[in-house]
Amino acid sequence: LQKPLLIHDCGLCCAALKDAPGPYTKYFNFSVGTEGLLALMRDQEDRRAGWDDAIVYIDENGHAHSFSSLDRYGYTGEISETGPTKYLRFEGPERAIGRCFVPTSFGLTECLADVSEEDYQRYRREAPSVWNDFAAWYAARETETK
């Protein structure tokens, strides 16, 4: 692989499950699924959860610079106690566990699968993003090197 190199991964992290499934979210989707996650969380008082977007940029000198949304913003929501009821989105198994995430720090009280299209798009557009953090860092870095 040549440098510079940009690597990205994202996973759902549940505090009560020691940040699992984390990097195994895709596997977890197909092996455990929404109902399995809800079962694992059934008796948990700590329902905090968040999406951990992780970016690693390896510069031309081989130095790694990492950015993590979970480290920067913490848990931004929780796992619903009942799961989605309307399924307005996320019908396929590939995003199964994301269905039951409730972005409470963004002011929403329903699972992402159940919120209106307007609220979903607003969440996608306005929620804190590690990509914005990376872009700001990269722009500042480019300015410094000129």
Predicted regions and their residues:
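Anionic-ligand binding patches
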Residues: 1-146
